[in-house]
């Protein structure tokens, strides 16, 4: 990690696995926060927009939850304020990609085009709404906005026939954070379970050959209903993770930036640290 990770990921690794300080994680994470409270500046390595964005702020939220950040901490208060100000009232969610993304180096999947929001839908808005609720007082403006987005996101969920695994992850995180507060929680979890099962790549020979969801991308602990259903595949996925470690002891991303290999070389190095943390967490949970 010391050779391959940014200071932020190194601080996260030390916090998660080596008894490191949560304050160091927050310190490095704060360096990506803008004056408006949102996050940018390449926090998500696949786009280098310096301005605040929903996706970079979503990434920051996940890392703040990881260190058990509370609503009273300055970094969280400013983030909540950003979410209130950046909510798009016409679309009734936070825009995933904006025209400004195209002005800076970025992976092809972050290219802004007209009507691109129909591709992303509630990725990451449903999860951002859950964080807004988690870090706000009941009856506050932030809390009410969070529930307003959750209500619309749940309507969309129940109507969906299939869904990309990243958006499924958003719903999984939101459901985990809100627990039984999330409407008819059994109905919600059943639908998420159904969509996750459909999105999962169940063919081990094809893992890593295209960008898609392996079992461990959708099954997050041994209490998950899908774990009991696909335990053998989870075990194969663990073996796969061990097999795909490079000689340097890390994992490479399974995607690239197409023709922009020069800038991808920088992003790839940054992703290596993030992927190492994600995979080590998976191995700790299931081994």
Predicted feature locations:
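Preference for long, amphipathic alpha-helical scaffolds in soluble/luminal domains
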Residues: 1-287
